[in-house]
């Protein structure tokens, strides 16, 4: 399994996110202005794109988001893998002694992020129809 980094959207990122967030979960506004300039990671299995996420800095903190694994590859710890890659990339860019990463997690998968040592802060809010919670981790 290998990964590649991209600045801005590419076809593989679009394909994975469309499959997961639009086709499966019914989101309508999946792509935004941030996608044009942020970093994206794509995991590949024999050149097949299977997982993606994006990360970017906003103010003092970094954000990881749009974590998506195609259906047939779920349950293989690829979410852990892509989050570790993103955190390593952020750690390399972080100039401060402490580095805070924020995630806007779907409430239904917040336990996944808790296992990666992210803590929920604030209240549940809606992104389109789906409950989300802000979660943070200090590196």
What name fits each language-model region?
Residues 1-13:
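A short beta-loop-alpha structural element at the N-terminal edge
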Residues 15-28:
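Helix-loop element at the rim of GNAT/NAT acetyltransferase active sites that forms part
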Residues 29-53:
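Conserved beta-hairpin
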Residues 36-37, 60, 127-131:
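Short acidic/glycine-enriched loop/turn segments that link adjacent beta-strands
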Residues 60-71:
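Conserved acetyl-CoA binding element of GNAT-fold acetyltransferases
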Residues 69, 75-89:
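Conserved acetyl-CoA-binding loop-helix of GNAT-fold acetyltransferases
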Residues 83, 89-106:
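Conserved GNAT acetyl-CoA-binding A-motif
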Residues 102, 114, 119-134:
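Conserved catalytic-core motifs of GNAT/GCN5-like acyltransferases
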